[in-house]
Amino acid sequence: MDQVVKIRVILDVEEDIFRDIEIELDAPLMHLHLSTLDAFNWDNANEMASFYQSNEAWDKGAEYPLMAMGPEFPSMENATVRDILPTPTSRGLYVYDYLRMWCFYLEPLAIGAAEDGVGYPRLMMEFGTTPDPMSREPEGLDDAGLFDDVFSDDAKTGDPEIDAYLDEDDDETPGMENIDDHVDLF
């Protein structure tokens, strides 16, 4: 008989927000991914995500991304719930939307036999009001100096010849600001 695990999926926010989901241990991680989004009412969300094996300190272990980087790599399609939660004391992480970095903690509450006639996965408990998945600002994009090095006028390469070339004045031709200023060159 198939085994099911009851997982507490805790959203990492200031308020207490979690969902308890029952799912078969041998179900693909894709089923847990979709049922987690559905349980948190993020079913219209279409961002990248990954599951990770974890430990008591919630460190990231082996990664199971939404899409594999190649046929020999694991993904949510070819890995199972058992891969991230191999024992009753295992822990897992789920990261959704790499720009907004929504992090969920996964803890198994119980493992038992599947009930006949019951469809899995299924939502067993809801606690807390889920925020909108777009309510969090993307991380790292609000840094005022993020692109200073890329778009700096005084960018230096470290090579004196190249730096001298880059420092040459572009306005050697008087009154020429842009090539478009002289459309009748030919």
Can you describe what each PLM-predicted range is?
Residues M1-F186:
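Short linear regulatory motifs enriched in tryptophan with gly/pro/ser
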